[in-house]
Structure formats: structure tokens, C-alpha cells
UniProtKB/Swiss-Prot annotation:
Span(s) of short sequence motif Nuclear localization signal: 10-18
Disulfide cross-links: none
Family: Belongs to the MUSTN1 family.
Domain of life: Eukaryota
Gene: MUSTN1
Protein name: Musculoskeletal embryonic nuclear protein 1
Function noted in UniProt: Required for chondrocyte development and proliferation. Plays a role in myoblast differentiation and fusion. Modulates skeletal muscle extracellular matrix composition. Plays a role in skeletal muscle function. Plays a role in glucose homeostasis.
Taxonomic source organism: Bos taurus
Length: 82
């Protein structure tokens, strides 16, 4: 006896086999020198050009020597009162 509210199990489809020659062509297309078009990357680049953020891992402005342990440059103390 079947119930009106019972659901049947979904039918799973098998993927077609992937050929090695298809993989070689796909790998070559991934690394072509294309400009990144994501909104996140675009906003990040605009912020860097405006000087409002530190150089990111995506920019080539990093030297690799930047760490959190660097001593701050000597300068006058800033006051929050003006």
C-alpha cells in the first residue's frame, strides 16, 4: 500500500567518465593571464590605490618582510583629544 504523502527517493545520475585529454585542455585555460573580475578584488584594489589599507597578499607591493612583530616608527604620540 502506498501513502499519498510518501516521497520516492531521488534518482541519482552517474557522471560521464572524464578523459585525460579533456583535463589537459582545462588546466591550460585556468592560468591564462586574465584580469580578475570579482567585486571583492576590485574594491580591494581601489582601497589600496586610495592608500586606505595596507598592501594585500594580492598586490605586488609587498616585500615579504611585513610582520606583526615590526616595531612602530618613532613619532609623536597621538592624542584622542585633538
Amino acid at each position: 500500500m502506498s501513502q499519498a504523502g510518501a516521497q520516492e527517493a531521488p534518482i541519482k545520475k552517474k557522471r560521464p567518465p572524464v578523459k585525460e585529454e579533456d583535463l589537459k585542455g582545462a588546466r591550460g585555460n585556468l592560468t591564462k593571464n586574465q584580469e580578475i573580475k570579482s567585486k571583492t578584488y576590485q574594491v580591494m584594489r581601489e582601497c589600496e590605490q586610495a592608500g586606505s589599507t595596507a598592501p594585500s597578499v594580492f598586490s605586488r607591493a609587498r616585500t615579504g618582510a611585513e610582520t606583526v612583530f615590526e616595531k612602530p616608527k618613532a613619532g609623536p604620540a597621538k592624542s584622542v583629544f585633538g
